[in-house]
């Protein structure tokens, strides 16, 4: 059942440098009238329209976010015995800020379709510029993190 329509809205987090028009998408809330009662967006924006070279977020520019990511790594390491050479994976790794908090003797891997512009931050880490899927990371990791990413996944 329709609840609220805000019409077509510009996609957030996208900063066009060339003055071109930012893509827009419908922003309509609907309510499941079945047993679930879920309030959700009616439409999903293709992930390639949001994440890529024009995605503008950078984890490292916000001190609160840097502190939070440091805490996430501290908590993960307190639960898992990380040994030299163990693989740690950050899905949606952005500029590599979270991975910077692991010791340099860990094999630090970031996967992010928007991270090509941050390649310099990954000199001592592995970067896979793509969306996460089994085919581009068939290995096992000792610790896997993903911050503020799952709400962008449709299924």
Briefly describe each language-model feature range.
Residues 107-112:
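Conserved SAM-binding motif I beta-strand of class I
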Residues 142-145:
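A conserved beta-strand element that flanks and buttresses the S-adenosyl-L-methionine
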Residues 95-105:
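Conserved SAM-binding loop of SAM-dependent methyltransferases across substrates and taxa
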Residues 83-94:
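Conserved class I S-adenosyl-L-methionine
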Residues 121-137:
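Conserved SAM-binding strand-loop segment of SAM-dependent methyltransferases
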